[in-house]
């Protein structure tokens, strides 16, 4: 039982040896180890075993990913998403997690590819639109200062803003209440692309957000 650590740990070997119940046993062990700081390493090891044995089981993946991220281990987290998407290419959660992680690592082109691959499976996770749109906006912002006196860079900057527009507009449509996320990006997109009508509308929205 989960509320009896000693009993659970006492019979862990027997539980794990029973193959039909192996998945359930691993989850029980993980939750038992998680209850105490003294067994945290065992918790991590159990998650590793669980993911290696059942890579398409999100339980082990999400908890392992959270541990890596809370300890600032982004490369390890990325390696985990590589394994997960490789083992379960149709898993939307894994693809979304990879796209989100790549965006946080400022690996923008890769995050767009990852977000697009998730959207190709399903658009049920609206944040994938936000990730791809944000990545394009960030790349545009990186060129802003130099683009003032460089026509080629300005063209590239505007291209990024243009690419970002449909993603961010779709995100806004799906998540109209999240003005805090799409308000500022769309403001900058419309401003730089000289979208007069759209800019006037978004200016009124952003005024209430900022």
Range-by-range predicted roles:
Residues 3, 37-38, 72, 106, ...:
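Residue-level detector of the short coil/turn that links helix A to helix B
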Residues 20-21, 54-56, 89-90, 123-124, ...:
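Short coil turns that delineate tetratricopeptide repeat
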Residues 25, 59-60, 94, 127-128, ...:
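TPR alpha-solenoid repeat register
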């Amino acid at each position: 039982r989960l509320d009896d650590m000693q009993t659970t740990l006492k019979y862990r070997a027997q539980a794990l040896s029973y193959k039909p119940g192996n998945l359930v046993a691993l989850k029980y062990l993980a939750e038992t180890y998680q209850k105490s700081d003294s067994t945290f390493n065992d918790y991590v090891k159990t998650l590793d075993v669980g993911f290696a044995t059942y890579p398409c089981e999100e339980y082990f993946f999400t908890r392992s990913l959270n541990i890596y991220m809370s300890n600032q281990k982004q490369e390890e987290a990325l390696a985990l998403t590589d394994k997960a998407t490789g083992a379960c290419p149709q898993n939307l959660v894994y693809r979304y997690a990879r796209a989100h992680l790549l965006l946080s690592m400022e690996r923008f082109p890769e995050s767009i590819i990852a977000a697009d691959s998730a959207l190709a499976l399903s658009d049920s996770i609206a944040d994938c639109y936000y990730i791809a749109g944000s990545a394009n906006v960030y790349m545009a912002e990186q060129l802003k200062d130099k683009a003032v006196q460089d026509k080629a860079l300005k063209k590239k900057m505007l291209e990024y803003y243009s690419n970002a527009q449909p993603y961010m507009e779709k995100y806004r449509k799906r998540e109209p209440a999240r003005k805090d996320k799409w308000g500022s990006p769309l403001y900058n997109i419309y401003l730089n692309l000289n979208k007069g009508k759209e800019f006037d509308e978004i200016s009124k929205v952003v005024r209430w957000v900022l």
